[in-house]
Structure formats: C-alpha cells, structure tokens
C-alpha cells in the first residue's frame, strides 16, 4: 500500500539523520551489491569503498547504534505492534548497485525521507510487477514475503528512505 504525502515534504527533509559525515562512530554501514554486503564503520573507509564501487549504503539497526527521533519512533512502533521493530536507513544515488529482486522476512513500513525511490512490487507470485515511485513524505507498506526490486530514478538522482521492519519476534 502506497500512501502519498503522509508527511509534509519540507518537514520531512528537515529531520536530521545520522548519515554520511554525521554518522555515529559505532554505526556500521553495509555497502550492498547483490548478495554481497561489505560492512564498514569508519567514515573514511565507507567513503573510500563507495568511491571504488558505487553501491547502496545501508545503515543497519539505526535505532540502536545512533541517537535520534527515529529511535523514539521505533520504540513507539514496538509498543503498538508488540513485535520487535528495527529501523534501517538506505541511502543511494542513481546507478548505485543494490540487492536486486528479493523479498524480506518482515513487514516493512517505509518512509521516503529524501529524493525518490522506484519500486517494482510483485503483489502476486506470478504476473507483472506494479511500479511505485515514492517521494519525500510518502509511506509504503510492504508485506512480509512480497517480492520487490528498487532503484533510484535519475531525477532527482538521490534517495534516502527508512525501513521500520516489524519482525515476527514478540516483545
């Protein structure tokens, strides 16, 4: 389910995120290329690895490794859903390598924070995918096990989205 403009775009873009130079020292960043995840925590090492081969940067377990409003949102969602929730940030540019088509083992509540993201979603196991473009302030609910593939459109050429992954683990 794609819900457009849940949050005001200017307000959403104004929210601080600990990415790039602002990332916490303990925050691990995975650079993904297919099923290859190259993890780094040093800012300079992340920048160097990205320059060598442009890949989507994944800030895993952001709610645990960094402080900010997203940690509070994660705790509130955990309390409401009564399931463990994990917040992860995905940062990419047009042309960055990524996971390719895959499915996830959690219910994803995805919030587009910066730029835009193109999603191909296969609601059925057979048939053509549905194309969805999320823009700043949009929310996409992606059920567990639904096959999808993402890319960053040439315009604006940049994307940051948060995934609040609602797991099967009860709390």
Give, region by region, the residue ranges found by the protein language model.
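N-terminal auxiliary "cap/dimerization" subdomain that precedes the catalytic jelly-roll/cupin core
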Residues: 1-56
